């Protein structure tokens, strides 16, 4: 049972809180690969750190508590978490994915799981009526991001979960962009939640990790087996870093999102900006749905400049904001999805779903917002062609 109903408190005290033996307020780092056994069949509950480690177990209990699941699982990366979840499916199964998802998710489905007989199809998950008609006997799951990467498309998670339950299939939600502080998909009917914990949960661009949570005991047993069998687990030190990062998630996201809301309004009013993608703007696609299922619009913004602006010059001129892969750290980061995060998606598919060569994705940090805006403004001014 959780110590509190409030997530702000759960972030700090949820899961396994400290060390009961020594009284240490932080979970110790059990930097060990194996555990001494008193005799044959006589262990302390720990045998080998791929199978289980006390530091990792504390993290797994914490994310289960935060998402409202029965079990959590920690992996060496977000893609390790996603791949282990996808390993639940078998030859002949098909998974419906959102029309814009992280390029790594597309790549592992297209280049790895397709070769193993697990196929996928891309659908507009915002159109529930049409989505319902796309479920054929071979479809076994929906895999959704909301807001989606990189266009921040919002999907009605409860609506999709209802369709999934009607057809007896699973709903898997990548909750990386929102985290359980802003959105809890299991409460909306999802069966499995995955995270690239590298992002907001870690929050400091110093750890690569992935998490999965389920509220279904049968799925939890299968995931536990596959986690151990596949072996892409998170080490104890990285587990400790993630626990530490999660403690400040609430205060960080409060600043992230406060900054993002102001920057989105600034970009929306800028004469050089053609389009702003941000779920927190009243005219955004899915604004009302996002308001219903999430605390706010999050801290990711994508935008496009009008013709006559050279985005290469924009990126080059930035001083405070770093051009880099990833997102969700305390520092502001910007990227070019077409050639970076979504480069593995064929150009014709990218263009069809709206990921243009002119799209810019901004991960809003927690710096003074005025400084971020000044840097964006300098970049836009430098990008204007004579």
Question: Where are the regions that the model predicts?
Answer:
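Conserved small-domain helix->loop->beta segment predominantly found in fold-type I
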Residues: 261-319, 323-325, 345-351
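N-terminal "arm"/small-domain region of PLP-dependent enzymes with the aminotransferase-like
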Residues: 1-53, 59-62
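Glycine-rich phosphate/pyrophosphate-binding loop
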Residues: 29, 38-58, 65, 333-358
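Conserved N-terminal alpha-helix of the aminotransferase class I/II PLP-enzyme fold
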Residues: 34-83, 87-88, 104-111
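Short, well-ordered beta-strand elements within core beta-sheets of diverse protein domains
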Residues: 242-251, 298-306, 361-365
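Conserved PLP-enzyme active-site core in the AAT-like
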Residues: 2-3, 13, 73-272, 277
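A common structural junction motif
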Residues: 230-231, 318-328, 379-386
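PLP-dependent enzyme catalytic core of the Aspartate aminotransferase-like
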Residues: 119-121, 252, 309, 316, ...
């Amino acid at each position: 049972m959780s110590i509190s109903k409030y997530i702000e408190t759960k972030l700090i005290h949820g899961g396994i809180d400290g060390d009961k033996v020594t009284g240490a307020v932080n979970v110790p780092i059990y930097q060990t690969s194996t555990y001494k056994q008193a005799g044959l069949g006589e262990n302390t509950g720990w045998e080998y750190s791929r199978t289980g480690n006390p530091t990792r177990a504390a993290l797994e209990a914490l994310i289960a508590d935060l998402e409202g699941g029965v079990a959590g699982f920690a992996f060496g990366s977000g893609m390790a978490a996603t791949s282990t979840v996808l390993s639940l499916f078998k030859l002949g199964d098909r998974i419906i994915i959102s029309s814009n998802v992280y390029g790594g998710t597309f790549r592992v489905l297209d280049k790895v799981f397709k070769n193993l007989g697990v196929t996928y199809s891309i659908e507009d998950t915002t159109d529930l009526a049409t989505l319902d008609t796309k479920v054929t006997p071979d479809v076994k799951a929906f895999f959704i991001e909301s807001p989606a990467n990189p266009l921040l498309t919002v999907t009605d998670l409860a609506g999709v979960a209802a369709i999934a339950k009607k057809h007896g299939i699973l709903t898997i939600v990548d909750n990386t962009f929102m985290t359980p502080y802003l959105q809890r998909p299991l409460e909306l009917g999802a069966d499995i939640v995955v995270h690239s914990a590298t992002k907001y949960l870690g929050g400091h661009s110093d750890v690569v990790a992935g998490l999965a949570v389920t509220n279904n005991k049968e799925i939890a047993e299968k995931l536990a087996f596959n986690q151990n069998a596949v072996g892409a687990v998170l080490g104890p030190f990285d587990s400790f870093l993630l626990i530490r990062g999660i403690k400040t998630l609430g205060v960080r996201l409060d600043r992230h999102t406060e900054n993002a809301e102001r920057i989105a309004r600034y970009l929306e009013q800028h004469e050089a900006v053609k389009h702003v993608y941000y779920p927190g703007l009243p005219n955004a696609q899915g604004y009302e749905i996002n308001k219903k299922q999430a605390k706010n619009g999050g801290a990711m913004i994508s935008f496009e400049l009008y013709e006559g602006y050279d985005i290469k010059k924009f990126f080059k001129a930035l001083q405070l904001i770093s051009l880099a892969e990833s997102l969700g750290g305390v520092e502001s980061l910007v990227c070019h999805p077409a050639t970076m995060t979504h480069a593995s998606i064929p150009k014709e598919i990218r263009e069809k779903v709206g990921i243009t060569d002119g799209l810019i994705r901004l991960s809003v940090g927690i710096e003074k917002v005025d400084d971020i805006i000044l840097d964006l403004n300098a970049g836009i001014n430098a990008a204007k062609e004579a």
